[in-house]
Regions:
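Conserved MFS/SLC helix-loop-helix module at the cytosolic interface between two early adjacent transmembrane helices
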Residues: 60-99
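Flexible cytoplasmic inter-helical loops of multi-pass small-molecule transporters
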Residues: 186-220
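Cytoplasmic helix-loop-helix junction between adjacent transmembrane helices
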Residues: 104-143
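Helix-loop-helix hairpin linking two adjacent transmembrane segments in secondary transporters
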Residues: 139-190
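Juxtamembrane cytosolic amphipathic helices that cap and anchor the N-termini
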Residues: 5-14, 220-232
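Residue-level signature of mid-helix packing/kink "hotspots" within the transmembrane helices
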Residues: 27, 55-63, 113, 147-148
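Helix-breaking motifs and short loop linkers at transmembrane-helix boundaries and internal kinks
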Residues: 41, 73, 94-100, 111, ...
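Extracytoplasmic
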Residues: 10-44
Length: 232
């Protein structure tokens, strides 16, 4: 297997692409809303409630997603999150009622809420502290990319097919991404694409950080977190 120089930056690009898909998926509903209303009766109140449902599940998962990823690991955990939100996105294209749309939106929020914690975990595993700001910037730039490409792409799909296909196609993009992810992602030291010098560089840098900042595991209650002003 041919090694790829500075493979960690390819990983940053890959999670940036996942973030772009994340934001593309969530833009489907507001952009396609006028077309959806030709099929499903959605009042302004209904639409506001649907958005609130999404934000509730998204915000909840955003808060606890990191813990779930710590348990599952970045490779499996991130893949599960993206499969979840991709299937939820496809579900939007299959519903025929406001209730179904609200359920699909709730499920989408659960999956997408784990996206940022997953990306952050990957960066912490592959990048020394001095490179993390740039790595965070690369994956976070995906949010802007997704938001920019969403309007013309969704409009084109609607023009060629219909609004249901905007959800189905963007959901399938996420599933294709997961296939690539599972083929290439492991921890740096087990990666078949990473050069020995890069493995040594990452390992040495991360170990130096741990040695310089030794920590002890302490259980922290949720209540104490909510009382901490820095959390807010």
């Amino acid at each position: 297997m041919k090694k790829i120089k500075n493979f960690r930056w390819w990983i940053a690009g890959l999670i940036g692409l996942a973030t772009a898909i994340n934001y593309l998926d969530r833009q489907n509903l507001p952009i396609a809303l006028s077309e959806i209303r030709k099929t499903i009766v959605i009042s302004d109140v209904d639409y506001g409630l649907i958005n609130s449902i999404f934000l509730f599940s998204y915000g909840t998962m955003y808060a606890i997603g990191g813990r779930i990823l710590d348990v599952l690991g970045s490779r499996a955990g991130y893949a599960i999150m993206i499969v979840w939100w991709s299937l939820s996105n496809i579900l939007h294209g299959l519903v025929s009622s406001v209730t179904g749309l609200g359920l699909a939106r709730f499920l989408l929020g659960i999956g997408e809420g784990g996206g940022f914690p997953g990306s952050a975990k990957v960066v912490s595993e592959w990048f020394p502290g001095k490179e993390r700001a740039l790595a965070f910037g690369i994956f976070n730039a995906g949010s802007s990319v997704g938001a920019v490409i969403a309007p013309p792409l969704i409009a084109a799909i609607i023009a060629v097919a219909n609004w249901r296909w905007t959800f189905i196609i963007s959901g399938l993009l996420g599933l294709v991404w997961v296939i690539v992810w599972l083929q290439i992602y492991t921890q740096p030291q087990q990666s078949k694409f990473t050069t020995d010098s890069e493995k040594d560089y990452i390992s040495t840098a991360l170990q130096s950080e741990r040695d310089a900042n030794p920590t002890k595991e302490n259980r922290v209650s949720w209540l104490s977190l909510f009382k901490d002003r820095d959390v807010w």
